[in-house]
């Protein structure tokens, strides 16, 4: 039995060695790309410094409105910061359980509304093409993991769904999901158990054009490479969304106490070739 285990482990060990050698190479390639082309910052943490800067770069709610696939309805505006607010360059989203009947979500699967929460989306869209072939999207988060909490940092199509790329998504546990949806059934998922997700961690995607139709999306947590997913996202504009849904895929019943989700050091940048 020991011999069999050793034989089985050998390919794994060689694979680990190969992966370890690839990771520095990826970082070097990305640095080389940045050096070779013009690098532009699209959004940075100055947009979390005050509401004037924030509202110049971000919209309140989802791009399509207040509802999505969970039991939270999003609230927020330039005059309503009960569920989305800024302090010391940190964005906080607060989900609060409601005690009255507010009907059901207008989005599939039309769950009963049990919470008020918050969502934001970028005014500028990510588009991978010949002019902007490389993008970096990253942010630091403190996330809740209580059953029923569903924080996310993700990209989704402006004109259709999919495309979708989930850079950070927790569903009521300490497991982060990094997903790429090419169709509703063609999905790549990389799951990582994060130690103390309620502490600050950095979630990052590097998106690079690799053909006339396809991109590679490299996913990272705290600077550690986790996976690369390939998808036909070239030329498809994407929103960047930060939100906290509740219940749904994250389980029920959700919390009765207020639930908090913090973000800082948001960064979106790209290379320009012309």
Show which residues each predicted segment covers.
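Bacterial signal peptide processing site
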Residues: 17-19
């Amino acid at each position: 039995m020991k011999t069999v285990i050793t034989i089985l482990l050998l390919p794994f060990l060689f694979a680990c060695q190969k992966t370890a050698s690839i990771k520095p190479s990826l970082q070097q390639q990305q640095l080389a790309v940045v050096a070779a082309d013009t690098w532009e910052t699209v959004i940075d943490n100055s947009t979390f410094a005050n509401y004037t800067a924030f509202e110049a770069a971000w919209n309140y709610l989802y791009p399509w409105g207040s509802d999505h696939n969970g039991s939270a309805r999003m609230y927020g505006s330039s005059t309503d910061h009960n569920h989305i607010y800024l302090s010391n360059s940190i964005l906080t989203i607060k989900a609060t359980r409601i005690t009255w009947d507010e009907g059901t979500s207008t989005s599939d699967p039309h769950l009963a509304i049990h919470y008020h929460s918050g969502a934001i989306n970028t005014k500028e869209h990510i588009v991978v093409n010949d002019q902007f072939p490389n993008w970096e999207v990253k942010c630091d988060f403190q996330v809740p993991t209580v059953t029923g909490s569903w924080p996310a940092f993700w990209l989704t199509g402006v004109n259709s769904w999919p495309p979708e790329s989930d850079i950070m998504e927790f569903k009521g546990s300490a497991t982060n999901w990094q997903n790429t949806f090419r169709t509703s059934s063609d999905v790549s998922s990389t799951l990582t158990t994060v130690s103390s997700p309620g502490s600050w961690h950095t979630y990052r995607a590097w998106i690079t054009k690799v053909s006339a139709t396809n991109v590679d999306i490299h996913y990272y947590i705290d600077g550690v490479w986790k996976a690369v997913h390939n998808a036909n996202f070239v030329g498809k504009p994407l929103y960047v969304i930060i939100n906290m849904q509740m219940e749904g895929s994250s389980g029920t019943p959700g919390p009765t106490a207020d639930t908090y989700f913090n973000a800082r050091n948001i960064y979106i940048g790209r290379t320009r070739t012309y």
